[in-house]
Each structure stands twice: as structure tokens, then as C-alpha cells.
């Protein structure tokens, strides 16, 4: 694993971020959301060159509603934010390098196999302290249960009596 070229490790990280298919128990952003993100990005680039043209994002031959596209974009932003905040939080312990901390957060948030560095396939998370393990556990829950239901728990409207 550690002898692999950097390009192969980058491909592995990208696959870890994408995760599995929609409806599966796999974590990650999911294949459908990733495809929609690329289509949305392509539309926005085209929009800069033809700002007056109405361009509909199509998926499997059907137009995708703007609300769905904004939800996908928001999910991606929240995913990246949680990944970076999680990696930063566990790096506060100062025990491991950036590669290890970032891939540890990614493996937990995406619920995939081993990371890189000190959390690689022949290593484990035992080198982290209690605070980092708590953060990583929360990332695992957020990744497994999807991000928005977890974030909804912290919304005040959920806890108000109706």
C-alpha cells in the first residue's frame, strides 16, 4: 500500500469519496450524486459562455429539477465541510500527519476500508486519543446514516412541541 504510486492512491481516494450506489448501504457521496454534480458543473461552465440560454440538466433522459440539483450541491458542500472539520479536529491531537488524519476522517465518513499512512491496511486507529476517536465515531455515524438526518437532529424545530 505504501509502495503504491501517488496517482494510484489519488484514484483510491476519489473512489472512497464517491462510495457506492444510491440505495446501498455504502457510504460516500454516491454515484448518482457524483454524476449530477458533474452535470451541474458542466451546465454552470456552459452558462458562463451562454448566459441567456436555458439549459436543463438531464439524467437518464429526464430533466432534473432545480431543487434536486441544489440539494445535491448542498450535500456535497456539507460532506466536504464535515470531512475537513473532522480531519482538523483529529489533527488537534498532533499525533499524525495530514495524510493520515485526512484519510482517517474520509474512511470514517465514507464507511470504507483502510486509509493511508498510519491508518493503512496493516495499521489501525489505536494511535488516536479519546477525543479523536469520538470525532471519528461521530463521522462514522454521520456517514452511515446520511448527513442530513444527523444534522436535522440539531435543528430546534425537531425538539419543539407542536
Regions found by a protein language model. Name each.
Residues 1-162:
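Membrane-proximal intracellular helices of multi-pass ion channels
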